[in-house]
A protein has these predicted regions:
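Long, structured stretches of catalytic cores involved in phosphate-ester chemistry, encompassing
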Residues: 1-255
Length: 255
C-alpha cells in the first residue's frame, strides 16, 4: 500500500498539507500522475483501473492468516485537524475535543469500514492481520484516562486524529449482542520511520479494567496488538540515550 509521499506529505482525499492548489497544479492531476508512477514501478496489481485510488484488498493464507490491506489516504480521508496546544520541548499537541469528536470524520470511508468489519467478523483464519498506513495505537504527550479527558496527543495525521472512526473499529473487535468478538487480531503499520509495539486499548491510561481500562502487566483490556515497522533508509527518532522512549512509555503504558 502507498504512503502519503507517493503524492505529497500528509495527503487526504481532496488535498494535502503541502499542496497549494493552482500554484502546484491541480490536486486531481497530481494524484493521477503519482498513482500512475506508483503502479508502473511497484510490483502490485491495480485492483480497479476505473478507480485507481481504491486499492484496499485482502489475501487469505490458508486457514492461518487473513490479511486485509487498507487505503487510508486518497479514497475518503477527511482533512487533518491542526495540533495547537504547545508542549515545551515537544512541539504542539491536541486534545480530542470539538471537531476531533465529529463521527463524520473518517480515514477509511463508510464503504471500506463496512468491508473491513465484514472481513473481520466472518474470517475463519486463526490470525486476522490488518496492514495499514498510520499508527492505530494512542500516542500521547500527556497521559490521562478517558474519564479525565484522555490527555494530549501528538499526531493528528494518525488514528488519534480520528477517534470516532477508531472507536468503530474497536466496536467490531469487541463484538456486540449479534456479533462475536474478533480474536487474534494484529495490526501492521508503517509511516513514522521507527519501530513500535503496542497493546491496543481504548483507555490505556485507566488501570481499572472493569470500567474498560487496561492492565499493562497482564494485557487485560487489550483488544488487538500493533507492530509499527521502521523505514529502510529514511531517518527516524534520534534517541541514542533512550530518553524519548522512556518518556513515551511513562505516559503510554500500552507500549
Amino acid at each position: 500500500i502507498w504512503d502519503d509521499h507517493e503524492i505529497t506529505n500528509d495527503a487526504w482525499q481532496n488535498g494535502a498539507q503541502n499542496h497549494t492548489e493552482g500554484a502546484e497544479g491541480a490536486w486531481v492531476d497530481r494524484v493521477n500522475v503519482g498513482l500512475q508512477a506508483y503502479y508502473e514501478w511497484m510490483p502490485v496489481r491495480v485492483p480497479d483501473r476505473s478507480m485507481p485510488r481504491r486499492n484496499q484488498r485482502a489475501f487469505a493464507f490458508g486457514d492461518l492468516i487473513d490479511l486485509a490491506m487498507l487505503e487510508e489516504r486518497l479514497s475518503a480521508r477527511s482533512q487533518q485537524l491542526p495540533a495547537t496546544i504547545p508542549i515545551p520541548g515537544l512541539g504542539n499537541a491536541f486534545a480530542q475535543v470539538g471537531e476531533f469528536t465529529n463521527p463524520a470524520r473518517t480515514l477509511l470511508g463508510n464503504e471500506q469500514e463496512a468491508w473491513l468489519a465484514q472481513r473481520l467478523r466472518t474470517s475463519d483464519a486463526r490470525w486476522k492481520f490488518i496492514g495499514q498506513g498510520v499508527m492505530f495505537a494512542q500516542l500521547k504527550a500527556q497521559g490521562a484516562p478517558l474519564s479525565a479527558g484522555g490527555g494530549l496527543f501528538f499526531n493528528s495525521d494518525q488514528w488519534d486524529g480520528y477517534q470516532p472512526a477508531r472507536d468503530r473499529i474497536y466496536n467490531v473487535l469487541k463484538g456486540d449482542a449479534t456479533n462475536a468478538a474478533v480474536n487474534n487480531c494484529v495490526i501492521l503499520t508503517g509511516d513514522i520511520h521507527s519501530s513500535w509495539a503496542a497493546d491496543l486499548s481504548q483507555d490505556p491510561n485507566n488501570p481499572d479494567t472493569a470500567s474498560g481500562g487496561y492492565d499493562a502487566a497482564t494485557g487485560v483490556g487489550s483488544h488487538a496488538v500493533e507492530f509499527v515497522g521502521t523505514s529502510v533508509s529514511s531517518p527516524g527518532l534520534d534517541d541514542p540515550q533512550g530518553n524519548t522512549a522512556r518518556f513515551l512509555r511513562s505516559v503510554n503504558p500500552h507500549f
